[in-house]
């Protein structure tokens, strides 16, 4: 199974991806996480340091792809999760998306796609185009990470559009498995968006300080819980997500709305709270009538 995880930059994709990878490994799966970001920090919390990237290795090999072996680019991490980092050109130079596309192709050529139960692509931000869209060419499922904010849902809407387009043009099925809410004490905007653009909500993680600290420490929650047992409840969020993924959900081909419609939808939610409350009361009344 291949998973592509997308979401707004800075939303906590990499921290979430690493913990989901460990959760899948705890369920007995052999997992490879591929970091698709020029910052090459996707797998940081699996080791506590930045591993050599595909670009680093190619430079050493003088860009002779035929001289690259799996052990040159695949590195062991905590919990038995293997890791690859694409890397990218220096800031302000080259194309990070091209490097991501080449990383995906190289991983396939090295037979990495066939050696693991789960391949998890952790992909840069919401730029689902060019090389950054290449993981969707191979993924069985896309998972979107978002919070209860406008920018994250704008990114969610654009990612949904990309998934729909890829699902339309691909011969291999691609589905949106659902949305994971991260750092989300409230979920009113998420619920409002999902009401208009239906998609499964796999999990909602509240704002938990230990998750932020885990990123700084370079550890997953599963490693931290070994010395801090009270964090078991946080691990359960990720294990629940992993269990839903492993159940091979039907998933959906999502729909999206225009940017202007999204602006109106979310801003009206706060600008017209009375109207929203009246609508909710009408819906509750209708539900009561149906039950009677």
UniProtKB/Swiss-Prot annotation:
Mg(2+) binds at residue 14. Pathway: Porphyrin-containing compound metabolism; chlorophyll biosynthesis (light-independent). GO terms for biological process: light-independent chlorophyll biosynthetic process; photosynthesis, dark reaction. Its cofactor is [4Fe-4S] cluster. Keywords: 4Fe-4S, ATP-binding, Chlorophyll biosynthesis, Chloroplast, Iron, Iron-sulfur, Magnesium, Metal-binding, Nucleotide-binding, Oxidoreductase, Photosynthesis, Plastid. It is an enzyme of class 1 (oxidoreductase). GO terms for molecular function: 4 iron, 4 sulfur cluster binding; ATP binding; metal ion binding; oxidoreductase activity, acting on iron-sulfur proteins as donors; oxidoreductase activity, acting on the CH-CH group of donors, iron-sulfur protein as acceptor. CDD domains: Bchl-like (cd02032). It is found in: Plastid, Chloroplast. Binds 1 [4Fe-4S] cluster per dimer. Its EC number is 1.3.7.7. One of its GO terms (cellular component) is chloroplast. [4Fe-4S] cluster binds at residue 95. Component of the dark-operative protochlorophyllide reductase (DPOR) that uses Mg-ATP and reduced ferredoxin to reduce ring D of protochlorophyllide (Pchlide) to form chlorophyllide a (Chlide). This reaction is light-independent. The L component serves as a unique electron donor to the NB-component of the complex, and binds Mg-ATP. Homodimer. Protochlorophyllide reductase is composed of three subunits; ChlL, ChlN and ChlB. This is Light-independent protochlorophyllide reductase iron-sulfur ATP-binding protein. It comes from Huperzia lucidula. The lineage of its organism: Eukaryota, Viridiplantae, Streptophyta, Embryophyta, Tracheophyta.
């Amino acid at each position: 199974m291949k998973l592509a995880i997308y979401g707004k930059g800075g939303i906590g994709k990499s921290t979430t991806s690493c913990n989901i990878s460990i959760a899948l490994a705890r369920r007995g799966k052999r997992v490879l996480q591929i970091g698709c970001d020029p910052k090459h920090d996707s797998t940081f919390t699996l080791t506590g340091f930045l591993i050599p990237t595909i670009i680093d290795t190619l430079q050493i090999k003088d860009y002779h792809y035929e001289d690259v072996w799996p052990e040159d680019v695949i590195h062991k991490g905590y919990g038995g999760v293997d890791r690859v980092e694409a890397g990218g050109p220096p800031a302000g130079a080259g194309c990070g998306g091209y490097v991501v596309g080449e990383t995906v192709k190289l991983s396939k050529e090295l037979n990495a796609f066939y050696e693991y139960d789960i391949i998890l692509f952790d992909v840069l931000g919401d730029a689902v185009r060019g090389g950054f869209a290449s993981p969707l060419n191979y993924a069985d499922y896309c998972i979107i990470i978002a919070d209860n904010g406008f920018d994250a849902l704008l990114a969610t809407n654009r990612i949904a559009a990309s998934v729909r387009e890829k699902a339309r043009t691909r011969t291999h099925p691609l589905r949106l498995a659902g949305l994971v809410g991260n750092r989300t004490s409230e979920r009113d905007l998420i619920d409002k968006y999902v009401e208009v653009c239906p998609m499964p909500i796999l999990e909602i993680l509240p704002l938990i300080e230990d998750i932020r600290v885990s990123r700084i420490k370079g550890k997953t929650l599963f490693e931290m819980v070994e010395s801090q047992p009270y964090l078991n409840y946080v691990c359960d969020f990720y294990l629940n997500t992993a269990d839903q993924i492993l159940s091979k959900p039907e998933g959906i081909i999502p729909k999206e709305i225009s940017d202007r419609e999204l602006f109106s939808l979310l801003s009206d939610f706060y600008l017209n709270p009375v109207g929203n409350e009246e609508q909710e009361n009408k819906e509750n009344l209708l539900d009561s009538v149906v039950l009677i």
